[in-house]
Amino acid sequence: MAASALSRACLKEVQPVTGLPMTQSAPNSNDEAAFPPPGQPVMGRINRLGLWTLYMKEVRRFFKVQLQTIWAPAITTMLFLVIFTIAMGRGDREILGVNFATFVAPGLIVMGMMQNAFANGSFSLLGGKVQGTIIDYLMPPLSNLELLLGLVGASVTRGVLVGIAVYIAMSLYPGVDLTLHHPWAVVWFGLMGAIMLSLLGVLTSIWAEKFDHNAAVTNFIVAPLSLLSGTFYVIDNLAPFFQSISRLNPFFYVISGFRFGFLGQSDIGDTNMAVLHGALGLGVLNAVLAVLTYLVLRTGWKLRS
């Protein structure tokens, strides 16, 4: 009897205590910050990581073959300077108060920037369509604006790198003086030209279905507009009719404005205000091109169909 009573007492002692709050681990604030509530978007308005990844992908693509994409264009542009200065005479002829080599060098620098920005922008989506890898651009969680920014940013980067390479090469050429008079003009017109051709390149890559289409735009639109934009001459030497046509060419304002940054003089107009008007006009033109490219990209024309 005593043993049974003792066992009953022990059972009563080991019974769980009820009514007391169970111990719980305190919530971790870091976990709450890492995992948002259900239904709340994980990414913000801009997918910064995705945008940066796309940009670096495009930069690494042309940097892997930098001899072809950066240094070869720099050498080709340098050959223009050598050939034209030898043909025209290095020290006998002056334009805008400087020798011919100093006059033509800034135009060649920004021309190289624009042409290579176009080459990079016109290849990305077209290469994806031809090689069957266009899905790599369309499937990631990137908006149309982010896709456009990544492509244009990489194209501008290539243009700037080519411009720096050409600048260094031409600075070493005898008779060339590339002293900066208006740094803001060099930066603004250089970037506006690179952005303009990058946007045109993206539009071309959307429209083109094969590399022949891309080459046609390069040979029949970009190259003529570049070479007939006052790179090797001032438009004041042209007949009034052709001067009016040249002033309708946006490449003319890029090249003459960029040259103004080095020489302090330009054939855009007789005053610095004319250069400012050209700078604002390029800004408006690029804004219109950016909106147009975005709208075409958003429709998925020739990309998703």
Question: How would you name each of these model-derived features?
Answer:
Residues 2-7:
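Extreme N-terminal basic, low-complexity initiation segments
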Residues 8-184, 188-305:
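Hydrophobic transmembrane alpha-helices and immediately adjacent juxtamembrane helices
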